[in-house]
Amino acid sequence: MVTQALADRLEIIEVCTRLHWCVDHRDWDGLDDLLADHVSFPTPAEIEAPGFDPASYLRSRAEVKAAYPGLLAGLLTQHLITGHQVELDGDRAVCRAHSVNVHLPDGGGRDALVAHGNEYRFELERTEKGWRISGRQTWIRWRWGDETHYEVDRRLLQWADQVRPVSSAECNQREG
């Protein structure tokens, strides 16, 4: 017999894994089935800032979807996510996972390959349509390869500019 807790864990793992699948396949519309209406997606640098508060990085799903293509422009990516650890708390959950992220310039050779070892903390909420990601925090634990063609830090700064911190009221106002 499958318990509700087990079904929830499986759905949460699927949602967190599918986020990276959509990113790698540039399936931006697929994010509609994975992200809450408002999400907190701070960059690694923002997470390390003194006084970091994930609630202050609330953005609309539409803003996050619009910012992703610029972050990944000119790159082939593959995110291998594993080791999901799910903590359920009623209609909210946290899922932690590790990943190895491979980045290669579109049309580039093996010498241009860049890899990152990341740790993720997903925050999820149960909705009428199932579990949705309401927040994600990322820590880059290690880097390998020549990042000069990739410029991850510059790209993340541009991402932060495109999905600047806003209040929940501002998100609702823009969508309204």
Give the location of each predicted region:
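Short, low-complexity N-terminal intrinsically disordered segments enriched in polar/charged residues
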Residues: 1-37
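Hydrophobic, well-ordered secondary-structure segments
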Residues: 1-14, 40-46, 66-67, 97-103, ...
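Aromatic-acidic/polar surface patches that form glycan- and anion
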Residues: 8, 12, 24, 57, ...
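A beta-strand edge to alpha-helix "cap/lid" segment located at domain peripheries
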Residues: 73-176
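A solvent-exposed, acidic/Ser-Thr-rich amphipathic alpha-helical stretch
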Residues: 28-100
